[in-house]
Amino acid sequence: MLTTHWLPAARLNVKQARKFSLLSTHASFPATMYRYQLERKATLYDVTQDETRHRKDAVNVSADGLVHAAISKSSPYSNGPVFMPNSRLMQQMLRFDFDRYQEEISDGKALLDPTVICIPRGTPIPSALVLWREGMSRFSLQPSSPMEIEKLNDALSEFYEKSGTVVGAQEWIEKHPYRESSPDDNEKGWMEV
């Protein structure tokens, strides 16, 4: 049985503590989780700098020039990449984003490398990052202490390379039919897969 490790409250950004609705904090992945992104490496960006990029890679950079761990009521909701188990909502979001990417290619946008990153259950989180559970089946990897966006991208890319498996989005969709996903409220179902 996997034990959830709770991180000390000191790792939270005290100035932003009232802005988020945090369900739990984890030192390891409590379930196998996935993330869709358009490139193999992390490409988070400052939401105020570029309106043309993939919105789910946007984060808020504070006035001090650093990314602070945060959950917001408006987009971007998480200040880090979102991971989800193979749930209905995850499948719907991934398929929608991949269909949208294919439409953009048809409209002449540049080819990218849409992938799904898989992080297995029990994988420890590096000290530079923290895993927050924000919703029923929604988790995000965020900086454990404020850092520059480039360093956050480097920490995430290194974590993906060392601890994750990267699969092409089309291949992942073909190997993971929607009918095999778990309802988001069936925590026992997706936690034990």
Where does each model-flagged region fall?
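NAD-dependent ADP-ribosyltransferases
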Residues: L2-V193
